[in-house]
C-alpha cells in the first residue's frame, strides 16, 4: 500500500498552515483521527502496529483520548489484551477520573495517534505511574520527530512508531503529489524542525 498517497487521497495528510497542540505552526497536518473512516488503510496501520508490539511483554494497552483510543482498541483486540484510556483532563461528572483502567501492578503500553513533543504521552505516563502501573513503551502511528522520542527516553520510555514523519514527507517531496511551492514549505520545515529537540 502506498501509505502517503492514501493519506493524501483520503485527506488525512493536509498541506497548509496548521497550529499544533504543541503550539507550533506546521505546513502539514496529519488528521489520523479520521483514519478509522477508511477501513482498508486503518486495518493496514493496525496490523503494522501489532507487528511492532507483539514481541513486547506487557499486560494492557492504554489509549490517549481521543486520537489514540481507536488504535489502542483494535490493537488490544487483535492481541487479546485489556484496554483502557486516559483523558487530558477530568470530566465534570461521573467518576471524574482521568484514567479509565485498573493499571496497578501492570505493564502498560501507552498508544496515541501522533507524537510531536511528547507532552500528551508524558502526561499519560505520569498518571499511569501514579496509579501504580509500569510504562516502558509508548506507541504512535506517526512520530513527527520533533522531540517526543528524546523527551520520553529521558523518563525511561521507548517511543515506538509505525511511521516516522521524515519517511512520509521525503516520499511526498519525491512524488508529484503536491505542488513545488508546497514541497519547498515542507522541506524548509523539515530542515528547521525535524530531529531538532
Swiss-Prot record:
It catalyses: orotidine 5'-phosphate + diphosphate = orotate + 5-phospho-alpha-D-ribose 1-diphosphate. Keywords: Glycosyltransferase, Magnesium, Pyrimidine biosynthesis, Transferase. Orotate binds at residues 116, 144. Pathway: Pyrimidine metabolism; UMP biosynthesis via de novo pathway; UMP from orotate: step 1/2. GO terms for molecular function: magnesium ion binding; orotate phosphoribosyltransferase activity. Its cofactor is Mg(2+). 5-phospho-alpha-D-ribose 1-diphosphate binds at residues 87, 91, 93, 112-120. SUPFAM superfamilies: PRTase-like. It holds the Pfam family Pribosyltran. One of its GO terms (biological process) is pyrimidine nucleobase biosynthetic process. Its EC number is 2.4.2.10. PANTHER family: OROTATE PHOSPHORIBOSYLTRANSFERASE (PTHR19278), URIDINE 5'-MONOPHOSPHATE SYNTHASE (PTHR19278:SF9). Catalyzes the transfer of a ribosyl phosphate group from 5-phosphoribose 1-diphosphate to orotate, leading to the formation of orotidine monophosphate (OMP). Homodimer. Belongs to the purine/pyrimidine phosphoribosyltransferase family. PyrE subfamily. NCBIfam families: pyrE (TIGR00336). This is Orotate phosphoribosyltransferase.
Amino acid at each position: 500500500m502506498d501509505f502517503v498517497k492514501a493519506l493524501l487521497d483520503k485527506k488525512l495528510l493536509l498541506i497548509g498552515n496548521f497550529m499544533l497542540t504543541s503550539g507550533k505552526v506546521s505546513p502539514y497536518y496529519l488528521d489520523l483521527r479520521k483514519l478509522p473512516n477508511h477501513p482498508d488503510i486503518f486495518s493496514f496501520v493496525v496490523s503494522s502496529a501489532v507487528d511492532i508490539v507483539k514481541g513486547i511483554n506487557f499486560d494492557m494497552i492504554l489509549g490517549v483520548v481521543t486520537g489514540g483510543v481507536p488504535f489502542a482498541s483494535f490493537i488490544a483486540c487483535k492481541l487479546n489484551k485489556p484496554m483502557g484510556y486516559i483523558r487530558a483532563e477530568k470530566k465534570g461528572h461521573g467518576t471524574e477520573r482521568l484514567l479509565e483502567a485498573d493499571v496497578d501492578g501492570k505493564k502498560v503500553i501507552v498508544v496515541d495517534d501522533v507524537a510531536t513533543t511528547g507532552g500528551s504521552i508524558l502526561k499519560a505516563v505520569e498518571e499511569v505511574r501514579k496509579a501504580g502501573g509500569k510504562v516502558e513503551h509508548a506507541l504512535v502511528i506517526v512520530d513527527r520527530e520533533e522531540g517526543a522520542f528524546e523527551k520520553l527516553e529521558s523518563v525511561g520510555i521507548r517511543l515506538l512508531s509505525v511511521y516516522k514523519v521524515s519517511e512520509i514527507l521525503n516520499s511526498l517531496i519525491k512524488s508529484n503529489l503536491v505542488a513545488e511551492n508546497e514541497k519547498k514549505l515542507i522541506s524548509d520545515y523539515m530542515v528547521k524542525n525535524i530531529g531538532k529537540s
